[in-house]
C-alpha cells in the first residue's frame, strides 16, 4: 500500500497499525460485528426473508438520525453549484457503484449535464461489473483520478465507504482538504478515519449486517437512501423540479414523452393534441410551460 505521510498520521491517530487493522478503543467497526441472526443455513426461506426485512426496517431510522448533517451538506452543495461547482462521489465496491448510479440518474431525471454530478469508482468502469483486486487499497489513486476531472475548490467531494477505512477514499479526501475543497463522507462506523478527514461526516449507524460483514446490505441500502436525499433535494433547490414534477427530464423514450404530455395537460388544462404539439415544438416540459405562459396561446395546425 502506498501511503502519504499525512494519511499515515491519520491512521495513527485512529489506532491504525500494520496490516491496516484497528486497535483503538475509540474505533469499533460495527460493520464487522457478528450478526444477531445465527444458523442462517438452517432457516426456511420465509424465516430468511423476514430476518432480512427486519434488519432493513432499521435503516430508515439510522438515516433519519443523519438529517442534520445531510442538511448541512445540501446547503453547502446548493451554494457551490450556483457558482458553477460540481458534486463528486468517490467510493470502492458497492459504495462506488452506488455513487456512479446516483450520478448517472441526474441527466435523464433533471436535465442537467453529465459533468455536474460525477461518480468515480476504484478500479474504473470494469469495477461496475466485477471486483478489481486491490483497487481500494491505493491511497493515492483516488486523488489522481479527481485531478483528471480538474477538481477545484468550487466543487464538493463526497467519499462513500461503509467501513470508513478504505484507503482509496480516505487518501482522496485528505488531499482534497489540503487543496481547500469541501469534503463530506458517508460511512456506517462512528469515529472512523474517513470521518476524520471529512468537513461534513455523515455516520449512518445501521448496526451489524444480516450476514456478518456484508455491508452491501443495510449499509448499501442506507447509502442509496442518503444519496437520493442529497441529489434530489439539491436539484429541487436548483429549480429543476416544478411542484412535484420532473419538468426538466430528458424525453428519451415513449414513456417519458407520454409523461411529459400528461404534465402539460394537467398544468395548462389543454387537450392531448395541443400538449403533444407544444412539447414537440419546445423540446422539454419546462420550455413548453414557459412558452405557453409567456404567449398565453398555442400554435395550432389549420
Locations of regions flagged by a protein language model:
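Cofactor-/ligand-binding subdomain signature composed of acidic, glycine-rich
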Residues: 24-62
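Residues at the C-terminal ends
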Residues: 82-83, 178
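Glycine-rich phosphate-binding loops that contact phosphosugars or nucleotide phosphates
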Residues: 88, 92-225, 234-238
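Short, amphipathic alpha-helical interaction segments embedded in low-complexity terminal/linker regions
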Residues: 234-302
